Amino acid sequence: MHMKTVRQERLKSIVRILERSKEPVSGAQLAEELSVSRQVIVQDIAYLRSLGYNIVATPRGYVLAGGKSGVSRLVAVKHAPEEIKEELLCVVRNGGRIVDVIVEHPVYGEIRGIIDVSSEEEVLKFVNLMEMAKTEPLLTLSGGVHLHTIEAPDEETMERIMRELKKKGFLIEEG
């Protein structure tokens, strides 16, 4: 088979695998399944992104963003670093997913980090990873003020999440 055709088939396979997967797919999994190196997968993902595929690298692997059913909302919140776990649990216990965290930086502008948690287990793993890495969370760059993209299966679930964030004093409201 011609080199170009082999790559095109592999690219189609990557998109198909990501479309069908309900969970993030690691580069190592893709490499093994497609019998190529991890580096080839990294290059293929970069190429697919250049073609317009919205492939996001999360701590647990690649996901093809968009096309999900449900509602998504960008939410402004403020809290101390030690309240991260409580904030994330507040969202997942009410049926939501925290996609990312976004902070404003005076020099760099917007800085975005992928969180991608939707269960208590994932929240605990994420918080544990932050503690083990001994790194400052992004919210420390902006005095605790930050944004999250939150996804929920429906508007009713999203409203429940918003009420809970407000009740805990995390939600920044207009006015």
Curated annotation (Swiss-Prot):
User: Per its UniProt record, what Pfam families does this chain match?
Assistant: 3H, HTH_11
Name used for this protein in its record? Probable transcription repressor NiaR
The record's annotation in PANTHER family points to: TRANSCRIPTION REPRESSOR NIAR-RELATED (PTHR40068:SF1)
State the free-text cofactor note: Binds 1 Ni(2+) ion per monomer; it is not certain this is the physiological metal.
Name the positions where Ni(2+) binds. 79, 87, 146, 148
Gene3D superfamilies with a match to the protein in the record: 3H domain, Winged helix-like DNA-binding domain superfamily/Winged helix DNA-binding domain
Q: Which InterPro entries match?
A: 3H_dom_sf (IPR035922), 3H_domain (IPR004173), HTH_11 (IPR013196), NadR (IPR026043), WH-like_DNA-bd_sf (IPR036388), WH_DNA-bd_sf (IPR036390)
* Top-level taxon of the source organism: Bacteria
GO molecular-function terms, A-Z: DNA binding; metal ion binding
Q: How does it assemble?
A: Homodimer.
Q: Which cofactor does it need?
A: Ni(2+)
Give UniProt keywords alphabetically: DNA-binding, Metal-binding, Nickel, Repressor, Transcription, Transcription regulation
Could you tell me which species this protein originates from?
A: Thermotoga maritima (strain ATCC 43589 / DSM 3109 / JCM 10099 / NBRC 100826 / MSB8)
- The keyword Metal-binding is annotated on this UniProt entry: yes
Described by its record, this protein's role is as follows: Probably functions to regulate transcription of NAD metabolic genes. Binds to DNA upstream of the probable nadBII/nadA/nadC and niaRP operons in a nicotinic acid dependent fashion. Nicotinic acid may be a corepressor.
